[in-house]
């Protein structure tokens, strides 16, 4: 499997450590005012919430997904169980589309 091949597998868990897949970059298109995940021959425009999830849960500086969920729970003053369910679903989708890897 390469970076462009989607990985369909089990859901992302709170103990997982995620990083952007090889060849994927988080970029800000200042002209359009949009953040996006760019990969070879494809891109995904992120809304405000998706950007917050990627920043909180993906990258070498993030201990694990649980730490990102805790950060988002505090930042948005929302019930942790709801935040966790939404975040894990979004991250699993991003992984299945080949944008993030464990």
Spans of model-derived segments:
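Acidic, low-complexity/disordered tracts enriched in E/D and polar residues
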Residues: 1-55
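Long, charge-rich, low-complexity alpha-helical segments
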Residues: 2, 42-102
């Amino acid at each position: 499997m390469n970076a462009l091949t989607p990985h369909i597998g089990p859901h992302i868990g709170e103990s997982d450590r995620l990083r952007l897949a090889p060849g994927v970059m988080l970029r800000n298109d200042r002209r359009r005012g949009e953040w996006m995940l760019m990969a070879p021959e494809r891109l995904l425009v992120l809304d405000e919430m998706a950007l917050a999830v990627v920043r909180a849960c993906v990258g070498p500086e993030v201990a694990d997904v649980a730490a990102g969920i805790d950060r988002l729970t505090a930042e948005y003053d929302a019930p942790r169980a709801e935040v966790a369910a939404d975040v894990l679903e979004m991250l699993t989708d991003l992984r299945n589309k080949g944008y993030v890897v464990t």
